[in-house]
Amino acid sequence: GQRFMRIDHIVDERMDPYTSTSAAMSLLEYNYSVLGTWPLALTAYNHGAGGIARAVRETETTDIEKIVANYKGRAFGFASRNFYAQFLAVNEVEKNALEYFGDVRFNPAPNFREVQTDAFIDAEVFASSIGVSLEQLRDDNRGLRPVVWEGNKRIPAGFRVKVREELVPSGDILPMVLADFKFAMQTPDIAYVVERGDSLSVIAGRFNT
């Protein structure tokens, strides 16, 4: 995941459906550039490009059916062995959704603007400054971890915040956040050195948690 996404204790872009989908596409393109066929690239999404390259070497074929039937790699288990077939099944169901599920009505996709922050900004301050609720901002930016929404960390500088077009005015909205609420540094982590006699409940009590 870290090849194409930011994953740390403040941001986890795997939780953002838009960013993670884009990253998945980038990974598939990378797998294809390494392995040369889409069946292998898709299987590598589960098993890794290196693992599939090893399977190709050991079976001396790029035919996914022959690899599935003959490759005996210890890590090549049920999920990897059936990943491509499952993809084909999902694709078939999606193409014939009406037959399988009836008349499904999808909600229209939201229209977002992405605003790249120019400083570290508290999430609640950012939301109130641009006129949206904190809950709405959180729902639209799931890549930010709970520490941001709980106020323990700020939205990082350079983070691309999604805001719904219909909820904010046109034009640059960053100036709506006053300079006094923009910081050059992230909120520092709290460190504590365990002392003799400490227990988890004692430490938690000292930090009111």
Give the ranges of each region predicted by the language model.
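Extracytoplasmic and endomembrane cell-envelope/extracellular-matrix remodeling and assembly machinery
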Residues: 2-3, 7-34, 39-209
